[in-house]
């Protein structure tokens, strides 16, 4: 009667254990890869959100200008049109991006010269080492009247790509409970051609 294991039995046991450990290792590596890709996608989304918020805030920005400014949109005091006015960057972006077109005659005198010069409609920023391309466009047609679309695409160097968009309307800029058509909104039929 023999005691112990034969060499063949030991080798078979080692092969079975090796296969089990290889399967476990492969599973762990797949999980690590998936976790890393998810983290990269999260980083890309964080960068995209940061640029989207910054560009949206630029479109929503307004400032106080004197009555003689070509950029005036709405008087601060309707009873005193020679006083200060509010100027909405929304109007500039809507009629300048992607190409400059004349605003409606009721806005900025209908002149391209009354739109702020030098607005950038697209570009690329790098956030956390992730390049983020952005694009601002005034929509055209009846469904696009008074709508500016901001789209950003972040592409992580290690793979994931995230695209986010936001539609900013003239009502986001100047929500007026007393007017059907607040100052930054083009009049019906007065949007981009």
From Swiss-Prot:
Pfam families xref list: N_methyl (PF07963)
Main localisation: membrane
Disruption phenotype annotation: Mutants have a wild-type piliation phenotype but are deficient in transformation.
SUPFAM superfamilies from the UniProt entry: Pili subunits
Membrane topology summary: Single-pass membrane protein
Location(s), subcellular: Cell inner membrane; Cell outer membrane; Periplasm
Database matches in PROSITE patterns: PROKAR_NTER_METHYL
Keyword terms, alphabetized: Cell inner membrane, Cell membrane, Cell outer membrane, Membrane, Methylation, Periplasm, Transmembrane, Transmembrane helix
InterPro entries per the UniProt record, alphabetical: N_methyl_site (IPR012902), Pilin-like (IPR045584)
Pro-peptide region(s): 1-4
Modification N-methylleucine occurs at: 5
Transmembrane spans: 5-25
Any single Gene Ontology cellular-component annotation: cell outer membrane
NCBIfam families noted in UniProt: IV_pilin_GFxxxE
Role, per record: Plays an essential role in natural DNA transformation but is not required for pilus biogenesis.
Name of the protein in its database record: Pilin-like protein PilA2
Organism in which the protein naturally occurs: Thermus thermophilus (strain ATCC BAA-163 / DSM 7039 / HB27)
The organism's taxonomic lineage, starting at the top: Bacteria, Thermotogati, Deinococcota, Deinococci, Thermales
């Amino acid at each position: 009667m023999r005691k112990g294991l034969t060499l063949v039995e030991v080798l078979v046991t080692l092969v079975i254990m090796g296969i089990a450990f290889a399967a476990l290792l492969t599973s762990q590596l797949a999980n690590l890869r998936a976790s890393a890709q998810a983290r990269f996608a999260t980083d890309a989304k964080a960068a995209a959100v940061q640029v989207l918020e910054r560009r949206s805030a630029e479109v929503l920005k307004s400032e106080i200008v004197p009555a003689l400014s070509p950029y005036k949109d709405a008087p601060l005091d309707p009873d005193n049109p020679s006083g200060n006015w509010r100027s909405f960057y929304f109007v500039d972006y809507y009629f300048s991006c992607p190409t400059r077109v004349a605003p409606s005659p009721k806005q900025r005198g209908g002149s391209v010269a009354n739109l702020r010069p030098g607005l950038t409609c697209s570009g690329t920023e790098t956030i956390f080492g992730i390049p983020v391309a952005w694009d601002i466009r005034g929509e055209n047609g009846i469904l696009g009247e008074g709508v500016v679309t901001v789209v950003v695409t972040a592409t992580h160097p290690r793979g994931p790509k995230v695209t986010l968009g936001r539609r900013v309307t003239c009502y986001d800029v100047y929500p007026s409970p007393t007017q059907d058509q607040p100052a930054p909104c083009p009049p019906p039929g007065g949007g981009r051609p």
